[in-house]
Amino acid sequence: MIVLPGIEVVYERFIDDYSSWGINGFINFDFDGSQAYRFENFEISPFYRFYFSRKKTPNMGFFVQPFISLTQGEYGTYRYDYNDDFYDYDYFEENFFGLAAGALIGRKWVNQKNYVFEISAGVGRLIAKEDEHNYYSDSTAYPRINFAMGKRF
């Protein structure tokens, strides 16, 4: 909520000391679109993580994370009508639904009291789009950058 008016909640379950699976959910609180950092109202994204660490604390250090992402949101767009004698445009608010797949790399630190800090960056690519005429469908790839703090239970 520091950068965006939204919140992301993550659940991660350890498989062993070097891998885990999880799911994260994002809810956007920018209901009127005044910030327009993200068009998604919500996003649900299951993931799998491979950790590359030689330390005694399991599931920390560098990781690679493939993910799938299911999103829904809304955006505003203009539609233009051109002909020889007349020019017109209308403003529409449209809903979208999308499915994306991607990967990211990151690093996770865990202290002795199990507080966690994590940074990651990656890219996702839309693989299913609802409509080829909307802005969201014109963007086929999107960045994914994350700074997270939390507590390991």
Each predicted region: which residue ranges?
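Outer-membrane beta-barrel "beta-signal"
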Residues: 141-153
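Residue-level signature of outer-membrane beta-barrel architecture
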Residues: 13, 50-52, 107-109, 125, ...
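Outer-membrane beta-barrel pore domains and translocons
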Residues: 1-3, 26-28, 67-71, 122-126, ...
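Residues that define the transmembrane beta-barrel architecture of outer-membrane proteins
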Residues: 3-5, 38-44, 60, 95-101, ...
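Short loop/turn motifs that connect adjacent beta-strands in outer-membrane beta-barrel proteins
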Residues: 17-18, 36, 53-61, 111-116
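Start-of-domain marker
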Residues: 1-39
